[in-house]
């Protein structure tokens, strides 16, 4: 057993032996990461649609693993991790897998799980960390309520587990911010220390005045 696994196992024992009884006695909730064995570091990608999240992932992994397009291309979360071959697993399969700490996602309901996917591919980068791609924010007036599952709760779940949150924003579409602002101020509350905002496509502006005029 590696040194990392030994330390992780010992930390989990301390949580179960000391912190969990204390949490129950004092009626406070342990963070998600304290309840489950730590795995690979993971990065969560958020942002409005067509902001470049999936394109960035494809560039990083040097393969077209995620669909891209000007219009919204997906309505679910996708976990990307290392595997010996390219494969895709559905939400029900991965939440019942004993080696994956995703059982807590069951409470988000079948509509969420039906849109959840895990993709494996033989990328050397994914031996060191996992990626979580999210559907683009729906910023049209009233459109955010058309999702058939609790998107904000899904964001919170993955954000709590994430070691880094990359929030892509397209400055060429400054009006598309309704759900984006809501996610920034609610599900990500208290997790700002993990957050990095990326102004993607900003190089398309000729100067700062052109950027400001949008």
PLM feature spans:
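Conserved G1/Walker A P-loop phosphate-binding module
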Residues: 1-139
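Conserved C-terminal guanine-recognition region of P-loop GTPase G domains, centered on the G4
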Residues: 101-138, 145-214
């Amino acid at each position: 057993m590696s040194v990392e696994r030994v330390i992780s196992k010992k930390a989990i024992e301390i949580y179960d032996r000391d912190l969990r009884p204390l949490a129950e006695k004092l009626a406070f909730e342990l963070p998600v990461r304290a309840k489950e064995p730590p795995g690979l570091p993971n990065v969560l990608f958020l942002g409005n649609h067509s902001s470049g999240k999936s394109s960035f992932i494809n560039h990083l992994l040097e393969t077209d693993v995620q669909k891209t397009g000007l219009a919204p291309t997906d309505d679910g979360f996708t976990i990307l991790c290392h595997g010996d071959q390219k494969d895709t697993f559905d939400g029900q399969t991965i939440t019942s897998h004993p080696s994956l700490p995703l059982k807590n996602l069951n409470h988000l309901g079948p509509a969420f799980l039906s849109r959840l996917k895990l993709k494996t591919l033989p990328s050397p980068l994914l031996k060191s960390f996992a990626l979580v791609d999210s559907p683009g924010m729906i910023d049209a007036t009233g459109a955010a309520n058309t999702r058939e599952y609790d998107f904000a709760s899904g964001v919170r779940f993955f954000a709590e587990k994430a070691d880094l949150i990359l929030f892509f924003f397209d400055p060429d579409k400054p009006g598309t911010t309704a759900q984006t602002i809501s996610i920034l101020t609610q599900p990500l509350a208290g997790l700002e220390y993990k957050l990095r905002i990326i102004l993607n496509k900003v190089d398309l502006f000729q100067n700062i005045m052109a950027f400001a005029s949008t």
